[in-house]
Amino acid sequence: MGEGPAVRLLVATRSRHKLGELRELLALADGVELLSPDDLGIPGEPEETGETFETNARIKARFYALRSGLPTLADDSGLEVDALDGGPGVRTRRYSGPDATDASNNELLLRELAGLPAERRGARYVCVLALALPGEMGPRGGLRILVRRGTCRGRIATELRGDGGFGYDPLFEPWSEPPGGETLGQWSAEAKNAISHRSRAAARMAPVLLETGFRA
């Protein structure tokens, strides 16, 4: 992008972990400044009322883009388990209740799937990235928002294994592993990023970022 003032891209998260992960996965061009709502002093959060990851990603991208006037990238992601008809889905973070923790969510998931054989424990991580572009109109009017999706297939283990990653990683066996094999909680960050739902969504968003000047 050459010399000159930084191009600013707002990421719709207050999580430094997610911000750092996206910075690494997106391979942005030199001169792109990645910001969070906290960096800009933007208060509040949108109400995520959607029943799909795409809807909620769009809600977050629109909310922060309109308040900042900056191009905004939003992520909505979670776990879909076949035996739970796609649950916990958009309720992934609060699966075990409003005060849910990773531990309580994993404990509930193990209880829900207790006794099921490996072939009935299929699951996938899903990530949807939405890029809102202030000043550009969408096909139906309003803010232009571009969406890309990535998935990572696997199965739910019968016990927690590994202390790496976060969320359901200690229970998630990637499809490349046999039943009872390693979970994402046992993988290095580099190995996980090579196959993760977020890395696949980021790869599909890369041409969009290139077109809009955020990627070299």
What is the meaning of each model-derived region?
Residues 2-10, 16-216:
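Anionic-ligand binding patches
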